[in-house]
């Protein structure tokens, strides 16, 4: 793989693509975590948060639990009307309750997106009425907005196209969405919020594979005189490919990850045009490369992909689609593949490769330089590297999201003759990887090498190195 940086090609200021992040409720972190997180990867412009209606309200007794104990089922799973994802839920060791979870994340974000989920099957199956669901939804959102006034976006349900989250039809989801629409409209009228609530959805797990469902939902809402204020989709590359193959959409399954997301944007905009609807924000608010696993090696695999996805879609003040990597904190036994941070036995936190990748992207600053990548094994190779310059210091982030160990050649053109210090910060299976490398504590990103490189009259800086599969590295070049 050859990475060519042209110092003379200025592309404008680098824009941080990590400004949109996900929290998790299923394995809530300690109350101190959001402040720590923002110190590492920056304050979120939008943080996605959650409330689970079946934990907030017991429809059997009519009791509300405003500060509920997260992840503790009120009844044995076999006694529930529908199991949802309860089999994968364990109470987090943090013991964080709902109020602390929501307010601690609200303090570290400009705005919140609140996903409201569960009771999808209860209302669809007639266990509770639509009027009851609407009242519960309104009560929950009003309570959360009081705790966190910076909530702007309300997301109606999550991944209802799969079994763990309700397995709804378009008709069933549309009825639920209209309940949420009426509830949000009343709250906005009642309170005249400084930050009005906006409602959207439906956070589809496999949006391309179930595109007919999305079109039907939008068509049904339009017939009711309702438009979504924003749209939300998810993309997990491995699962997306499998889902598309199962649907016999082999041509789309064969696209690269970036290609699939661009295809999603294309059919989304076609849908809006077909129905005569205006463009609204599109949140890709769960994004990953790996499967959902507890396999240690999948953390590095996912991180390398996240770098390319964020560079492809996040480096804009007004992106076509807002990428939210999944996720800042989760149960490592179930989602080591995705979580950016871990809770250590002493109560401190450690960065996984996903956290290292996000932090490296966040910490870049300066004028973006032109970069070309040649002879890469990886797909979407144009997003495998980014270079910036600030005060004559050049930072270059390079990822190898392929299944091969590759020899790499780095060239930087336009350098004055002289000696340069090249500092390397490598993340692979051995370095800056607290998941697979026992010597790494994950507290900071440690430099892994310093070398001197001489630039002659040609003005070309050259360096040769090797990246193992799915490794990534940050190089810093400074005049000696």
Language model segments and positions:
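Non-catalytic accessory regions flanking glycosidase/transglycosidase catalytic cores in CAZymes
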Residues: 1-153, 167-207, 223-227, 273-279, ...
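Conserved radical SAM core fold
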Residues: 28, 53-59, 119-123, 157-164, ...
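Short acidic, glycine/proline-rich loop/turn micro-motifs
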Residues: 60, 124-126, 165-167, 242-247, ...
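Short, internal active-site loops enriched in acidic
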Residues: 119-121, 159-162, 204-209, 287-292, ...
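Noncatalytic carbohydrate-binding groove/subsite architecture in carbohydrate-active enzymes
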Residues: 172-309, 316-319
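Histidine- and/or cysteine-centered catalytic micro-motif in compact active-site loops
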Residues: 236, 287, 328, 399-402
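Flexible glycine/acidic-rich beta-alpha junction loops that bind and position SAM and/or redox cofactors
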Residues: 241, 291-292, 326-340
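Extracellular glycoside hydrolase catalytic/binding regions
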Residues: 293-310, 342-345, 349-356, 364
């Amino acid at each position: 793989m050859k990475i060519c940086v042209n110092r003379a090609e200025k592309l404008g200021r680098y824009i941080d693509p990590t400004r949109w992040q996900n929290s998790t409720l299923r394995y809530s972190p300690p109350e101190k975590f959001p402040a720590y997180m923002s110190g590492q990867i920056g304050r979120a412009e939008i943080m996605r948060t959650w409330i689970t209606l079946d934990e907030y309200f017991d429809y059997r007794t009519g009791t509300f639990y405003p500060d509920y104990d997260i992840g503790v089922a009120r009844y044995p799973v076999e006694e529930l009307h529908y199991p949802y994802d309860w089999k994968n839920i364990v109470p987090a060791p943090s013991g964080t309750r709902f109020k602390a979870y929501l307010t601690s994340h609200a303090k570290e974000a400009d705005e919140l997106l609140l996903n409201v989920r569960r009771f999808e099957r209860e209302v669809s199956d007639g266990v509770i009425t639509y009027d009851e669901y609407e009242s519960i939804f309104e009560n929950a959102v009003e309570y959360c907005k009081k705790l966190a006034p910076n909530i702007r976006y309300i997301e109606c349900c999550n991944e209802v196209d799969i079994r763990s989250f309700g397995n709804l039809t378009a008709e069933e989801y549309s009825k639920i969405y209209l309940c949420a629409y009426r509830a949000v409209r009343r709250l906005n009228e009642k309170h005249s919020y400084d930050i009005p609530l906006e409602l959207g959805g439906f956070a589809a797990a496999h949006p391309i594979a179930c595109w007919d469902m999305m079109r039907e939902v939008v068509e049904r809402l339009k017939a009711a005189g309702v438009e979504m204020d924003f749209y939300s989709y998810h993309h997990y590359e491995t699962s997306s490919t499998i889902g598309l193959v199962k649907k016999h959409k082999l041509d789309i399954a064969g696209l690269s990850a970036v290609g699939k997301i661009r295809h999603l944007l294309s059919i989304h905009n076609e849908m809006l045009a077909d129905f005569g609807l205006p463009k609204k924000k599109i949140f890709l608010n769960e994004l990953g490369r790996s499967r959902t696993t507890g396999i240690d090696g999948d953390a590095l695999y996912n991180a390398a992909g996240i770098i390319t996805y964020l560079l492809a879609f996040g480096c804009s003040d007004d992106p076509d689609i807002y990428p939210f990597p999944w996720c800042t904190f989760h149960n490592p036994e179930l989602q080591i593949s995705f979580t950016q941070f871990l809770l250590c036995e002493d109560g401190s936190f450690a960065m996984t490769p996903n956290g290292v990748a996000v932090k490296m992207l966040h910490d870049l600053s300066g004028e973006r330089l032109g970069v070309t990548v040649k002879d890469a094994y990886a797909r979407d190779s144009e997003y495998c590297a980014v270079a910036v310059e600030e005060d004559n210091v050049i930072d270059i982030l390079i990822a190898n999201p392929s299944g091969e160990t590759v020899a790499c050649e780095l060239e930087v053109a336009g350098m004055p003759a002289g000696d340069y210090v090249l500092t390397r910060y490598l993340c692979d299976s051995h370095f800056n990887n607290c998941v697979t490398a026992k010597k790494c504590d994950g507290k900071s990103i440690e430099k892994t090498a310093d070398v001197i490189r001489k630039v002659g009259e040609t003005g070309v800086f050259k360096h040769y190195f090797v990246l193992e599969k799915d490794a990534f590295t940050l190089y810093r070049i400074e005049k000696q």
